[in-house]
Amino acid sequence: MPGVTVKDVNQQEFVRALAAFLKKSGKLKVPEWVDTVKLAXHKELAPYDENWFYTRAASTARHLYLRGGAGVGSMTKIYGGRQRNGVMPSHFSRGSKSVARRVLQALEGLKMVEKDQDGGRKLTPQGQRDLDRIAG
């Protein structure tokens, strides 16, 4: 369907399709520590899905498509959540900076993302074309 963009499709189906594309291409550089890491300080366990790095990369690429100029700090805010403190009140906790940084570096290696002159990262025209092609 011509003219279909990432904004027009269901986000969950798109992220799954993009993650499958990234895994099938085999070009995404996955760190060796992916099976032992938690994704945030507020998480109790590591992710159950063994392909979580591809899913996180797809989700990050989608976020950069929708709002470019996001860096490591804003990605930690996006993937943050509620920190439970037992009997004390809950507070917001950010996601892992190391995971966000490695995902952005891996997407830079695929030439989907580049550093923005105003700070943060943005999608390259090639990356935007890939995302629109997968959405269609």
Curated annotation (Swiss-Prot):
Superkingdom of the source species: Eukaryota
Modified residues (N6-acetyllysine): 23, 111, 115
GO biological process annotation, one example: ribosomal small subunit assembly
SMART domains: Ribosomal_S19e
Entry keyword annotation includes Transcription: no
Molecular-function GO terms, alphabetical: RNA binding; structural constituent of ribosome
Record flagged with keyword Cell membrane: no
InterPro entries the record matches: Ribosomal_eS19 (IPR001266), Ribosomal_eS19_CS (IPR018277), WH-like_DNA-bd_sf (IPR036388), WH_DNA-bd_sf (IPR036390)
Gene3D superfamilies (UniProt xref): Winged helix-like DNA-binding domain superfamily/Winged helix DNA-binding domain
Alphabetical list of SUPFAM superfamilies matching this protein: Winged helix' DNA-binding domain (SSF46785)
Pfam families documented for this protein: Ribosomal_S19e
Signal peptide: none
Subcellular location: Cytoplasm; Nucleus, Nucleolus
Sequence segments annotated as region (Disordered): 116-136
Chief place where the protein resides: cytoplasm
GO cellular component, one term: cytosolic small ribosomal subunit
PANTHER family per UniProt: 40S RIBOSOMAL PROTEIN S19
Protein family (similarity comment): Belongs to the eukaryotic ribosomal protein eS19 family.
Subunit comment: Component of the small ribosomal subunit. Part of the small subunit (SSU) processome, composed of more than 70 proteins and the RNA chaperone small nucleolar RNA (snoRNA) U3. Interacts with RPS19BP1; the interaction is direct and mediates the integration of RPS19 in state post-A1. Interacts with RPS19BP1.
Protein known as: Small ribosomal subunit protein eS19
Organism: Sus scrofa
